[in-house]
Each structure stands twice: as structure tokens, then as C-alpha cells.
Amino acid sequence: MNEAHLRICASPEWAAFVESELLPWVLREQDLGDEVLEVGPGPGLTTDVLRRQVPRLTAVEIDERLARSLAGRLAGTNVTVLHADATALPFEDGQFSAATLFTMLHHVPSAALQDRMLAELRRVLRPGGLLAGTDGVETPARRDLHADDDYLPVDPATLADRLAAAGFAGATVEVQEDRFRFAATVPA
């Protein structure tokens, strides 16, 4: 994540948006269960909201500096932070009741790696487990914000098929203006 993007994702304005609009929209009518995995929390503003809603939360961040900072800030809470690559998760099969991806999928640098990550999430979710997330629709402003950064926008029109190919069932994708939310489950 480049520095300009990181400043936005760590800002009080983004924190307010995440808490009042983004997470309530993505998680509306979703049961996350008792053991939740968050992939790509960045500076952790989504983690701050999510940890108040679930008993146990594990956050996986590929950026070592961000993972270390978040782990230090959330030490002693119900959150475990790991520096790890979500395309090769260090967890047992079926360990989590739910997994979340909040505005991070576009940072995975290739469609093949995005699909590998989705398959890994399928692997670590229990039967009946939920995958829920959101990402932005590609716009010139978003492309500019990601200058000198990994940026591979996901086409919401193809995401349900990609989730099915990864082993998920019942995928839904809803576009709202410049963003979309998605959800799918692991077959029981």
C-alpha cells in the first residue's frame, strides 16, 4: 500500500465511514460465528470495528510493518494478528466460522493469486462457514490512488463464478455506486 493510500486508510474520516456505513452494509444479516478471520486489515480500522462484534478475531496482514503495528496496538484484546500470506494460510482446515475481506482484494496482484486466496479461505472455513467482503469498482480516481502499488480490480460481474470455482456456494454480489459487497458459504 503506497503512503497516500495508507494515510487515507488510517484517517479518522475512513474510520467513521467504516464504522457507520461500510461494515454495517457488508455484514447486514450475516452471522459471523465465534472464530473469525480478517484478511488484509492494513492499519486495522476495520479490525477495530469487527473485534467488538465477535468473540475471537484473527487478522492476517501480508505487510510486515502493518502487521507488527497492529499486533502491538491490539495486544491483550480478542484479536490475534499474524504476518502471513493469504494465498498460503498457516491454519488448519475448517478452523474459522467466517472470513472477511474489506477493500483488499484489489491489492492481490494477479487473478491467479486472488483465486488461490479464495480457495485458501474456502479451505480454512468450516462447513457452513461464511465469506463476506467488499471492494471498490474500478474508477480513474482509484487507479490514481494506487499508483506505484499493486492494483488489480475485481470485476463484480465475474466474482460469483470465481467464488463457485473456489468451492463456495450461494454466492451473492451486490453493486452499490462505486463499490460492491459479496457473500458466499462453504457447503455444509
Question: Where in the sequence are the language-model features?
Answer:
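C-terminal alpha-helical "lid/dimerization" subdomain adjacent to the S-adenosyl-L-methionine
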Residues: C9-A10, W14-A15, L130-A183
